[in-house]
Amino acid sequence: MIIKWTPSPNFTVGRKGKKIIAIVDHITAGFMPGCLNWLCNPKAQASAHYLVTRDGRIFQLVKDENTAWHAGMVNRPYWQLYDGTNPNYYTIGIEHEGFPNKDLTEAQYQASLSLHRLLIQRYDIPIDNEHIVGHYRIDSVRKANCPGPKFPWDRLFNDLRKGDEENVVRIKILFEGKELDGFIKDGKAYVEVRKLCEALGLKVYWNDKKKQVEVSK
């Protein structure tokens, strides 16, 4: 995957101490080169970290560690991760060349899929519809069609999860003579909490109210 650095002046240095926790997908409502020029124009007062074009190219306009101006206006949001502060500080913005009523091209989709995978791995972003969202979830009034009805959400999540599963290696963990099922992902070994605790003679209880696992002797 080739990412071309094309700097935009429209950004804020740093992220106000916030951690990147989500990806926000956008549609440009315009074609190249106009959309790229606009995102790099100081008069626009707008930008994104990345732009994915219809021919499959990826441009990076703002460094990940800095704040791009892509989703700062909040209007009737329905997004669980919104914490009352500017979403730009804790999100990565990806623009897609095109219009809300047009499908992404296959080259564009594959490039966007690869970029999502890279960011998910880099920032440990969960693959779900709260951590990967459309702009409309943050501004449901002004940006109701961003990225629009043609954006391939189902396909994107299916492909991302498929790739996530392919990175998992199933293993057996031998614990004091007992064989436990586990798996390796990203160089780390995991085992089911309940099975491990039971092997240790501990009791496991799921507290649904607090949404936490409780372990006792």
Predicted stretch roles:
Residues I2-T6, V13-G17, Y89, E97-N167:
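Basic/polar, cationic surfaces and motifs that engage anionic cell-wall
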Residues I27-A29, V62, L119-D124, L160, ...:
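Sec/Tat-exported extracytoplasmic proteins
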Residues A29-M32, G56, F99-P100, R137-K143, ...:
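Acidic glycine-/aspartate-rich tracts in secreted/extracellular proteins
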